[in-house]
């Protein structure tokens, strides 16, 4: 579905139950591609979009999930604690590898970049710092409140981000509140 945009790049996977990512634009897409992660259903897609005389690369990414339920109970015993720690350690290792692949791809890009995606990690993480680099966090530029994008039972978490180059002005940022886990 094009959602009334003139151009799109859609990358779908799966058989009967499809999943994937898409980039929609009112401006012409002149190139597109994907960064595939080894042994993962997660990935990054990108599109080079022309507006006037400027070309920018837009990335959409979905990194490894940490697989923690939003319904965390107050009482966690030692066994459950070890299980959660193991799951986090495994996910963070995979995310680190994914972030480093993405960073390498950024280095070869000659256009200004806009990066959008689900990092499945906090703004205090290695993954966030690696992918953000010297770019601006759009929420920090123009957002308000917690900016939550994942609604844990006892606290909000921001795991989805938009980063832009210094030469791109962030005029507005809205967090969509209708999505619930």
What label would you give each PLM region?
Residues 2-69, 162, 169, 174-177:
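Structured beta-strand-rich core segments of catalytic domains in phosphoester-bond hydrolases
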Residues 63, 118-119:
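Active-site metal-binding loops of divalent metal-dependent hydrolases
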Residues 69-73, 126-128:
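Short aromatic-enriched loop/helix-cap "lid" or pocket-rim segments at secondary-structure transitions
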């Amino acid at each position: 579905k094009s959602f009334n945009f003139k151009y799109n790049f859609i990358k779908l996977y799966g058989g009967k139950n499809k999943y994937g990512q898409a980039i929609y634009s009112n401006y012409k897409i002149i190139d597109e591609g994907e960064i595939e992660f080894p042994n993962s259903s997660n990935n990054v897609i990108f599109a080079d979009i022309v507006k006037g005389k400027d070309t920018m690369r837009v990335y959409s990414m979905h990194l490894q999930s940490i697989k923690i339920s939003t319904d965390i109970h107050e009482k966690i015993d030692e066994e459950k604690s070890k299980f959660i720690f193991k799951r986090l350690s495994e996910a963070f290792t995979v995310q680190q590898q994914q972030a480093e692949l993405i960073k390498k791809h950024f280095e070869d890009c000659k256009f200004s970049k806009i990066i959008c995606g689900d990092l499945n990690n906090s703004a205090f993480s290695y993954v966030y710092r690696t992918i953000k680099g010297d770019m601006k966090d759009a929420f920090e530029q123009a957002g308000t409140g917690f900016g939550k994008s994942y609604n844990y039972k006892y606290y909000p978490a921001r795991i989805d981000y938009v980063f832009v180059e210094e030469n791109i002005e962030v005029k507005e940022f809205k967090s969509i509140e209708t999505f619930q886990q």
